[in-house]
């Protein structure tokens, strides 16, 4: 990824506490959707144009489906072409 394509790069602390309100068997899935919606709302991008790194997904699923982390610190890279990448810092 050349540097000229990056329009914005920030590190965000993303709260995932809302996932605890869903059923125990859906908490990790809910955390992924909360992550997408949070980044979409803050950076004003469409949720279909958000790419989540597999390592971020592994971090959420690390302790299993029922116990996702309550918050994550992630690096968000917004590209000029309109897509947004979510990676670990």
Swiss-Prot record:
This is Large ribosomal subunit protein eL31. The keyword Ribosomal protein applies. Gene3D superfamilies: 3.10.440.10. It comes from Thermoplasma volcanium (strain ATCC 51530 / DSM 4299 / JCM 9571 / NBRC 15438 / GSS1). The keyword Ribonucleoprotein applies. PROSITE patterns: RIBOSOMAL_L31E (PS01144). Keywords: Ribonucleoprotein, Ribosomal protein. GO terms for cellular component: ribonucleoprotein complex; ribosome. It comes from the Archaea. NCBIfam families: PRK01192.1-1. Belongs to the eukaryotic ribosomal protein eL31 family.
